[in-house]
Amino acid sequence: MERFVKEIEVGNENRLFEFTRMENVNGVKFFITSKDEKKKPISFSLVRAKDDNWKLNPGSLRWLYGIESQLADAIRESRLN
């Protein structure tokens, strides 16, 4: 498993997101951990979609959809995809 950390702006604050690359028979996904605005740990996944894009799994926290493109950009920049 390969990992990297990226700081992403959420609202008015910067938060650290730790990305872990995982691969199985269904393909590649990234398991991501961070903390919410109350400093409670959260985790979620992004999976590869069409056109080499990355999408949140359905049912993710609503505020994550606002930074989905930044999360996808972080994966592309890491060159681990």
Give, region by region, the residue ranges found by the protein language model.
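A short, structured beta-strand/loop element
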Residues: 22-52
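Compositionally biased, intrinsically disordered low-complexity segments
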Residues: 11-13, 28, 70, 78
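Acidic, low-complexity intrinsically disordered segments
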Residues: 40-81
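Residue-level detector of functional hotspots within protein domains
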Residues: 3-5, 16-18, 30-32, 40, ...
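A mid-sequence interfacial segment
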Residues: 1, 12, 34-37, 77-81
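Negatively charged, low-complexity tracts enriched in Asp/Glu with abundant Ser/Thr
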Residues: 1-25
